[in-house]
Structures are given as C-alpha cells and as structure tokens.
Amino acid sequence: MGYNIFNPAEVVPEYTVDVGTKKGEKVDYAIFINGQPAILIEAKSHEDPLTTYDAQLYRYFSATTAKFAILTNGILYRFYTDLSETNKLDNAPFFEIDLLSIKDAAVAELKKFHKEAFDAESLFSVAASLKYAKRVKEIMGAELKEPDDDFIRFFLKDIYAGKATQRAIDDFKPIIKKALNQYLNDQLNDMFKAAI
C-alpha cells in the first residue's frame, strides 16, 4: 500500500488510544498522514471471526482523529468509517476484500487507500457510494433468490391488469423469479459472447 512500516512517523505499531476511563489501550497499527492518525488497523488471527472485535475497534475509532478503520484477520479485510454519525464507527463495513477471492473491482477500490492516492475527503465519498451499492446488491440478491410480496407488486403494476391480491402475487412470484433469473443469464451470455 506504499506506507513505510519502518518509519514510525508513518506506521505506528501498538498505537496507544486512551478510551474514556480505559487508559493505554492499543490499536495494532495506526497509519499517520500529515502527522495525524488517518487509518487504524486491528489485526487478528486468521482463525478468529472478525465480528467479535467490532466493539473494540469502535472504541479506538471514537477516541482518535482517524477517519478510517480496518479490521482484518489477514485474509478478510473490512473497511469502516463514520458515515452514519460523526466520530462513531458504522456497524457495518463499507467495503470488504477477501484475499482468497479477489475481484478486479475490489482491487480498484483498494488502490484508493494507497499512500500516493490517499485523499480522506474523496475516500469518504467513495465509502458512501460503496456502502449503499453494497446494500443494493444484497437486497437485489435476496430478491432474486426469494422475492418478497412488495417486489412482486412492483412488477405486477406494469404487467397485470387485475388487482394485486395475495393470490395474484403468489401466482406471479415463480414467473417473475424465473424471468429475472433468465434475464440475468441472458445478459451474462451476451457479455461472454462479446468477449469471445
């Protein structure tokens, strides 16, 4: 990522963070930019589930001027910031990268954290976009697997002349689900054909 781990003014291991009445707590690493902590990194064992440490990172984040925090087990990296409320770490990461299954789009986003590219303000905007795009993909994935009634109603208003009763919703649910999945398959096939 371009940060000099041997420069104590740039990467500080075991950075001391005084949190309320708890003095001397330490975050594993703090990356400093212009003399201020910009990114906090809490590193855990690759065997540890990351969810158990979110509260710890939350405390560290609120006690510093850092705008970004990373929770990692060396395989999965979760990136956090304070989009919902200033100085309070969001509950969910705005970005995740899994080194065992890296996607090109994730690499492009990760490069924005490189020392030469780091810009806290623009990264904050990127974080907001990533957070909401991630949520849209989660919702869309869930709807494609098992569409809820409101999702079916959305289509019914344009394709069905009758009233959207529960029976109509139940009748159209498998049709709409199948059509959406066929549409996605067709789009993927077209992309593959164009690539060949």
What is the predicted function of each stretch?
Residues 1-68, 79-196:
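A short, conserved, highly charged catalytic patch centered on acidic carboxylates
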